[in-house]
A protein has these predicted regions:
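Catalytic Zn2+-binding segment of zinc metalloproteases
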Residues: 1-13
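Conserved catalytic/binding loops enriched for acidic/polar residues
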Residues: 11-127
């Protein structure tokens, strides 16, 4: 959909505590990319008082950036170079991890859910 590719790095953008925090989840969801392919948030505990909505995947921060990068138009620009410069200015404040995701490597795995996989797994086992 919209050209989004698998992004297993989406979940490692957030810590184990962030993926359990109801305020964080309402604002950002539990992964930076829906293309991380994590079916639900298994780290949340009953005591976290998270609703079902926050347990389900949704578009994340990376997804919005990728869609804007691929589809944004610059009506005032005169050439592709000006478009590229405008895009770089737009994304200056974002982490390089959002700009160039890694989908393979020791840092990322399918189903890892956070940057702290052992801590997150501990939460899951408590459920």
């Amino acid at each position: 959909v919209l050209g989004l590719k698998e992004n297993l790095a989406g979940s490692v953008a957030y810590t184990a505590e962030e993926v359990k925090n109801v305020t964080w989840l309402k604002a950002r969801g539990y992964t930076a990319s829906i293309m991380d392919n994590n079916p639900y948030n298994y780290a949340v505990q009953k005591s976290d008082k998270v609703t079902v909505k926050e347990l389900m995947p949704r578009l994340g921060e990376y997804d919005y950036l990728a869609i804007e990068w691929g589809y944004r138009e610059f009506p005032a620009s005169k050439n592709a170079y000006m478009d590229r410069e405008a895009l770089w200015k737009t994304f200056q404040g974002y982490s390089a991890g959002y700009m160039f995701p890694v989908s393979q490597g020791i840092e990322v795995r399918a189903g890892d859910l956070s940057s702290e996989p052992l801590k997150t797994l501990g939460y899951a086992l408590n459920n």
